[in-house]
């Protein structure tokens, strides 16, 4: 059963990740359709899942949410490396946004809805100035999602990602708060 409501999108809700969600995380994070394109997810056993929950998901370094419809978990979204607050001179006020969804929920608009809501939270509630995202050049779905939400391709790290037996470029995307706000009008 997902935790209490944190944010609400059009079709999904975002909730804190709870210990009860570890079964879902374990199943999906071990699915090659998720960990291969994500590039930084390692397959894990239950003990490693517990450790991941304790050291990453339960830490105060970042925001980690479970995207759900009703009571069904769909995927995970995160804001990490965030430096936020009202003091514009001493903080960069930037964060990296990341997401992954269970394969059975791909292509249904849940990722776009959930990511848009987390972006809104980052800019309006956390006063961030910019968001960044990394994606392998082979991941057309994720690139399409980012671009549909206004992210701009800012650079490429050539042959920085190993995927399915080949090196691929790693693309860096960025979105500024002003760009997001003008796209919402």
Describe the predicted segments one by one.
Residues 26-27, 54:
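Generic alpha-helical structural context detector
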Residues 36, 60-62, 128-130:
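Short secondary-structure junction motifs
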Residues 2-6, 43, 61:
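Proline-rich low-complexity regions
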Residues 1-23, 29-31, 68-185:
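Acyl-donor (CoA/ACP) binding surface of acyl/acetyltransferases
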Residues 37-42, 63-69:
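A short, aromatic/hydrophobic, helix- or strand-capping loop or linear motif
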Residues 53-66, 73-75:
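A short helix-loop-beta-strand connector motif used in the catalytic cores of GNAT acetyltransferases and
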Residues 31-32, 59:
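Polar helix-capping/helix-linker motif
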Residues 33-55:
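Conserved GNAT-fold acetyl-CoA-binding loop/helix
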